[in-house]
UniProtKB/Swiss-Prot annotation:
GO CC annotations on file: plasma membrane
Keyword Cell membrane listed: yes
Keyword tags: Cell membrane, Membrane, NAD, Quinone, Translocase, Transport
HAMAP family: NDH1_NuoD
Name of the protein described by the UniProt record: NADH-quinone oxidoreductase subunit D
Length: 370
């Protein structure tokens, strides 16, 4: 049978989110589809906006610490570390050496816990229910350690301007060493269960590729940038705290696809363990909190400080007018930048690949919307 007219398809609009298990929060994307292929992506954010930066203006410098836990709520210790270090630089406060080591241990444990959520969630997004349980099993061990130290598993409120709130309990060190030893076995399990799985590799290799040049142009940082071949890690290149005392390898990929971003997190957890082990060898007894005023009043001025968070560069810009409350705070969150590259990476892919691409960026809406 012959037809004297051409067959064609019409473009279709699909709302992805804001309440969808694969959006990792209340995030919405509008896909324009030609069949199953995405021809355009529009980011819609703001559903979780809480006015964090404005709230800071009516809180003392110390009172704002718990609010930072609610940014990337999977990386509370890292959020707190970046904030208190910024205030310390502005106020000229020296931190006791033991507190510096405790901060490093807590920060790297938090990095491991954050990466475990990334790995488990991405596996689950690709229908990997069994791997998800393995990753979250090990994350529970980290959260138990955090709870042992500060009494909370996620919103820790542990860092203080001038150190940490209190010293490590006696049972912490043996429990930490046991966990670090157990992780050697876990890495072997990860490889066997999912990383080396042919189906998983088919879903992630060559998917969501972004070049190093484009990654830099979009402002990507952290594992997402290093997966595209850019060798940049603030812990090594602009060391803060006492990171210059530790030997570790900066993991750098080359392919810039979903699989490479996955490998970044696996390998970075191993490096975090190396850092923690070195810190355990070097830490000495001493005070954990400097003598600072109850109401901290930094001199007039402004400062910007950034750290290497679990998802990328986390920065704080603080303006002080000399009183006990910040005049202005701006938070540079890596997830806000990373999600901006999603349309570029998802355009031309299929819907199922877009799920993998979004998961590989590891966004978290508490940090995007603030």
């Amino acid at each position: 049978m012959e037809y004297d007219r051409e067959l064609h398809t019409e473009e279709m609009t699909l709302n992805f989110g804001p309440q969808h298990p694969s959006t990792h929060g209340v995030y919405r994307a509008i896909f324009t589809l030609d069949g199953e292929h995405i021809v355009n992506v529009e980011n819609i954010i703001g559903y979780l906006h809480r006015g964090m930066e404005k709230l800071a203006e009516s809180r003392t410098y110390t009172q704002f610490i718990p609010y930072t836990d609610r940014l990337d709520y999977l990386s509370g210790m890292l959020n707190e570390l970046g904030y208190v270090q910024t205030v310390e630089k502005l106020a000229g406060i020296e931190v006791p050496e033991r507190a510096e080591y405790i901060r490093i241990i807590m920060a790297e444990l938090q990095r491991i816990a954050s990466h475990q959520v990334f790995l488990g969630s991405m596996a689950l997004d690709l229908n990997g229910h069994t791997p998800w349980m393995y990753f979250f099993r090990d994350r529970e061990k980290v959260l138990d350690l955090l709870e042992m130290v500060c009494g909370s598993r996620m919103t820790t409120n542990y860092m203080r301007i001038g150190g940490v709130s209190y010293d490590l309990p006696e049972e912490f060190m043996p429990s930490l060493k046991s966990f670090l030893n157990d992780m050697d076995k876990s890495f072997i399990e990860y490889e066997r269960i999912i990383t080396g799985n042919e189906i998983f590799q088919a879903r992630t290799k060559g998917v969501g590729i972004i070049s190093g040049e484009k990654a830099l142009a979009y402002g990507l940082t952290g594992p997402n940038l290093r997966a595209s071949g850019i060798d940049l890690d603030l812990r090594r290149d602009a060391p803060y705290g006492i990171y210059d005392r530790f030997n570790f390898k900066v993991i750098v990929g080359k392919d810039g696809d979903c699989y490479e971003r996955w490998i970044m997190r696996i390998d970075e957890m191993e490096e975090s363990i190396k850092i923690i082990k070195q810190a355990l060898e070097q830490i000495k007894e001493g005070p954990v909190l400097a003598k600072v005023p109850r109401l901290i009043k930094p001199p007039k001025g402004d400062i910007y400080h950034q750290i290497e968070g679990a998802k990328g560069v986390l920065g704080y810009y603080i303006v002080s007018d000399g009183c006990d409350k910040p005049y202005r705070i701006h938070i540079h969150g890596p997830s806000f930048v990373n999600i901006g590259a999603f349309p570029e990476m998802a355009t031309g892919s299929t819907i199922q690949d877009a799920v993998a691409i979004l998961a590989s960026l590891d966004p978290i809406l508490g940090e995007i919307d603030r």
